């Protein structure tokens, strides 16, 4: 059920307090116990593959935690999740998206009959999205006979003028649709093997699917068959594989 406007703002204020407290405590703990805090963050990063990512050392990203940029990004993500309109078994939001040629369309346009449609939300500056991109491509190779796939390029997770990581791709926050389309074109160098579209500048699909910084879904016949947990800590293409294998068996 859609939150009434006063209720939404009350929830936003509560989230603001939670995030501010989290960042303040994180700063204090990082100052007093830097080694322990880094160990805890590295332990969490095992879920994302960041600890195994050859393009990043922990010094490229752990020092950015609890910064002002970290605060604003986490707050944006947490606020966005208040607008989550999805649940397994529920109707999938038919949000507008834009093809790389600039044509406006909708998510449901990519559904074909009763075939499952796998949605992969992410951006080039999201290390876990890129690190696991080959896993996603293998899903396409293995299940293209029974399912369709769609990549939805959303706002940058770690824009160079936002919560930036060292040694990451240099893409600034998108100021207009052309910026977003240019960023999405970089994915073509990775041969995605499925259509790539971008979210509108209102970020409607990202908000209604609570997709920032990255997330996986499986739709079927207009409904949500699988709702992956939000990334980066819980972005798992292997869970989509299990869903598709069950459908194929």
From Swiss-Prot:
**Alphabetical GO biological process terms:** amino acid metabolic process; hormone biosynthetic process; thyroid hormone catabolic process; thyroid hormone metabolic process
Which Gene3D superfamilies does the record associate with it? Glutaredoxin (3.40.30.10)
Write out the annotated subcellular location.
Answer: Cell membrane; Endoplasmic reticulum membrane; Basolateral cell membrane
Source organism superkingdom: Eukaryota
* Spans within the Cytoplasmic topological domain: 34-249
Q: Which E.C. number(s) belong to this protein?
A: 1.21.99.3, 1.21.99.4
Q: Which PANTHER family match?
A: IODOTHYRONINE DEIODINASE, TYPE I IODOTHYRONINE DEIODINASE
Describe the protein's quaternary organization and the partners it interacts with: Predominantly monomer. Can form homodimers but homodimerization is not essential for enzyme activity.
The record describes the protein's role as: Plays a crucial role in the metabolism of thyroid hormones (TH) and has specific roles in TH activation and inactivation by deiodination. Catalyzes the deiodination of L-thyroxine (T4) to 3,5,3'-triiodothyronine (T3) and 3,3',5'-triiodothyronine (rT3) to 3,3'-diiodothyronine (3,3'-T2) via outer-ring deiodination (ORD). Catalyzes the deiodination of T4 to rT3, T3 to 3,3'-T2, 3,5-diiodothyronine (3,5-T2) to 3-monoiodothyronine (3-T1) and 3,3'-T2 to 3-T1 via inner-ring deiodination (IRD). Catalyzes the deiodination of 3',5'-diiodothyronine (3',5'-T2) to 3'-monoiodothyronine (3'-T1) via ORD.
Similarity section: Belongs to the iodothyronine deiodinase family.
Q: What is this protein called?
A: Type I iodothyronine deiodinase
> What's the name of its gene?
DIO1
């Amino acid at each position: 059920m859609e939150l009434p406007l006063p209720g939404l703002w009350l929830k936003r204020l509560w989230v603001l307090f939670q995030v501010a407290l989290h960042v303040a405590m994180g700063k204090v703990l990082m100052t007093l116990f830097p080694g322990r805090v880094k160990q805890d963050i590295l332990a969490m990063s095992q879920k994302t593959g960041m600890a195994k990512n050859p393009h990043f050392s922990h010094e490229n990203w752990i020092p950015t935690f609890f910064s002002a940029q970290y605060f604003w990004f986490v707050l944006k993500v947490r606020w966005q999740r208040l607008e989550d309109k999805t649940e397994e078994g529920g109707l999938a939001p038919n949000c507008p998206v834009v093809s790389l040629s600039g044509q406006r369309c909708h998510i449901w346009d990519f559904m074909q009959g009763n075939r499952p449609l796998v949605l992969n939300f992410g951006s080039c500056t999201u290390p876990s999205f890129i690190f696991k991109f080959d896993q996603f491509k293998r899903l396409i190779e293995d299940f293209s006979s029974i399912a369709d796939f769609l990549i939805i390029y959303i706002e940058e997770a770690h824009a160079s003028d936002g919560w930036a990581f060292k040694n990451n791709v240099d893409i600034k926050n998108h100021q207009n649709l052309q910026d977003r389309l240019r960023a999405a074109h970089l994915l073509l160098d990775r041969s995605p093997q499925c259509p790539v579209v971008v979210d509108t500048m209102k970020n409607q699909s990202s908000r209604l699917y609570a997709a920032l910084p990255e997330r996986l879904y499986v739709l079927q016949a207009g409904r949500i068959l699988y709702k992956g947990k939000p990334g980066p800590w819980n972005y798992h293409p292997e869970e989509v594989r299990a869903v598709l294998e069950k459908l194929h068996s």
